[in-house]
Amino acid sequence: MKKFTCVQDIGDLKSALAESFEIKKDRFKYVELGRNKTLLMIFFNSSLRTRLSTQKAALNLGMNVIVLDINQGAWKLETERGVIMDGDKPEHLLEAIPVMGCYCDIIGVRSFARFENREYDYNEVIINQFIQHSGRPVFSMEAATRHPLQSFADLITIEEYKKTARPKVVMTWAPHPRPLPQAVPNSFAEWMNATDYEFVITHPEGYELDPKFVGNARVEYDQMKAFEGADFIYAKNWAAYTGDNYGQILSTDRNWTVGDRQMAVTNNAYFMHCLPVRRNMIVTDDVIESPQSIVIPEAANREISATVVLKRLLENLP
């Protein structure tokens, strides 16, 4: 594996899952693999789980780790070509990236959608510049359109908790006071569509995702109908994708908050969320604190997904 930005990069899912469960039994089995190798983690945006889990994964593999917060202590970076740099950004990403590549063996990048221009976001300009110019293997720690480390961990979690070979998995939109990127729902849909699960997406009209991520999923605008018989409920907010509404909040309808009313029609479903979660906006206290909430094991599996990804990138270093 030379990069990791989407489900296709991981290859065969059964093999990746088997490797995940192997590593979960012995997290330090490959501690010699990363000896004298350095991971550079670059954050354009805030992080808790991604930062901690990826750093822990690198340590599991014996790597050195450098963490760079672009907006705290580093030069402000210009990202557009052709710009006259007479403002407050003294360095261009096109010089910074190859310099960063000089100091490490693998690069992880976290850069959210800006919601200024959909084409810019969906062309993944930032992470693709790292792939093109760093001279190093690059993996996504969440980009504008996908969050594959999260989705891989979600898949591991579902495989651990499922009670039937083909569970019904429902991803539901839920309200939030701020417009959030589509990266997590896009990525979750992409990974679920790579399985044989029954996969349903439910949201209010106007919140349709990019069709290339929706794929063969059934889209249901009636949340209660979508929840019927579900084995897993994956809640997430996202801003509008379509047309002139890109990046906007179209609804804050609290009827979409996941609570006991919705969970009652499921097949005693497990509740999942990538975290951080806005309680009593996305989900009620009762649901997230219930025995069916698996958000903490889900978050713990971020270490496992990151370890598998880093291991595979290390194995393909020259």
Curated annotation (Swiss-Prot):
- Would the keyword Lyase turn up in this protein's UniProt record? no
* Keyword Transferase annotated: yes
Listed EC numbers: 2.1.3.11
Marked site, Key residue in conferring substrate specificity for N-succinyl-L-ornithine versus N-acetyl-L-ornithine, at 90
* Reported phenotype of the disruption mutant: Disruption of this gene results in mutants that require exogenous arginine for growth.
Entry binding sites for carbamoyl phosphate: 47-50, 75, 110, 147-150, 274-275, 302
- Protein's pathway: Amino-acid biosynthesis; L-arginine biosynthesis
Q: Which UniProt keywords apply?
A: Amino-acid biosynthesis, Arginine biosynthesis, Transferase
Q: Which SUPFAM superfamilies match?
A: Aspartate/ornithine carbamoyltransferase
* Example GO biological process: arginine biosynthetic process via ornithine
Record field: catalytic activity:
N(2)-succinyl-L-ornithine + carbamoyl phosphate = N(2)-succinyl-L-citrulline + phosphate + H(+)
Q: Which residues bind N(2)-succinyl-L-ornithine?
A: 142, 176, 236, 278
Q: What class of enzyme is it?
A: transferase
- One term of GO molecular function: ornithine carbamoyltransferase activity
Q: Which family does it belong to?
A: Belongs to the aspartate/ornithine carbamoyltransferase superfamily. SOTCase family.
Q: Cross-referenced HAMAP family, in alphabetical order?
A: SOTCase
Task of the protein: Catalyzes the transfer of the carbamoyl group from carbamoyl phosphate to the delta-amino group of N(2)-succinyl-L-ornithine to produce N(2)-succinyl-L-citrulline. Is essential for arginine biosynthesis. Has no activity with either L-ornithine or L-aspartate as substrate. Also has no detectable AOTCase activity, being unable to convert N(2)-acetyl-L-ornithine to N(2)-acetyl-L-citrulline.
Subunit structure, per the record?
Homotrimer.
Name by which UniProt lists this protein: N-succinylornithine carbamoyltransferase
* Source lineage: Bacteria, Pseudomonadati, Bacteroidota, Bacteroidia, Bacteroidales
Record gene name: argF'
